[in-house]
């Protein structure tokens, strides 16, 4: 076989967090500085793909007019994003505002949520009051949580085959990703936790855990 570089990581066993570098007013920083904070915190897409968020927030030479947060979670049995939006609605909305600032304040900021999540919708509507963030619910139908499908549902635009949403002036992030980005910038938190759903016959109690 072919040889290649190898990196060996050896833990010191101390389990110590780095010192948090909080930022009380991110609007005093440039978009590039904020993207770097998000990169250094290891924020990646929490909708499943795990794509680095910093890269997605830097659509070079492209003007973004629509930011979409995906709160659809259309897969069966999974309710982690539903729980997240109920318990951390204000952080999700703050994350939407942060991402919009980084992207140059797009004219439209939308959070898309399927209508089978009434408690999450109510919490998000309350948190988004007096902001530019618009909460949009729509009929529950798989696979509406897919990036291209959700874009078509919310904007009536179809992303061409082989193209990225940014070519239409659209950036989409998961609701959990938006919250993680906000907490990385505001509190200096690295991405070390998330809410996830545990289900199955082997469990006495099926639940969401943090």
Describe the role of every protein-language-model region.
Residues 2-46, 51, 61, 118-119:
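Acidic low-complexity segments
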Residues 86-102:
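Histidine-anchored nucleotide/phosphate-binding helix
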Residues 106, 110-210:
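Hydrophobic alpha-helical positions that pack around
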């Amino acid at each position: 076989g072919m040889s290649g570089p190898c990196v060996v990581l050896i833990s010191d066993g101390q389990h110590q967090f780095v010192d948090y570098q909080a930022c009380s007013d991110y609007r005093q920083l440039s978009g590039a500085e904020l993207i770097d904070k998000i990169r250094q915190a290891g924020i990646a897409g929490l909708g499943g793909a795990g794509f680095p968020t910093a890269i997605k927030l830097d659509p070079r030479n492209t003007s973004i007019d629509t930011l979409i947060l995906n709160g659809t979670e259309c897969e069966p049995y999974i309710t982690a994003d539903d729980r997240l939006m109920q318990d951390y609605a204000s952080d999700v909305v703050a994350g939407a505002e942060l991402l919009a600032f980084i992207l140059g304040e797009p004219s439209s900021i939308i959070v898309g949520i399927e209508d089978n999540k009434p408690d999450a919708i109510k919490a998000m509507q309350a948190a988004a009051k007096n902001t530019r963030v618009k909460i949009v619910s729509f009929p529950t139908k798989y696979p509406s949580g897919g990036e291209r499908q959700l874009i078509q549902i919310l904007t009536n635009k179809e992303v061409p085959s082989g193209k990225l949403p940014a070519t239409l002036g659209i950036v989409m992030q998961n609701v959990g990703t938006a919250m993680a980005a906000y907490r990385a910038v505001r509190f200096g938190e690295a991405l070390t936790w998330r809410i996830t759903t545990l289900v199955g016959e082997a469990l006495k109690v099926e639940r969401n855990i943090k």
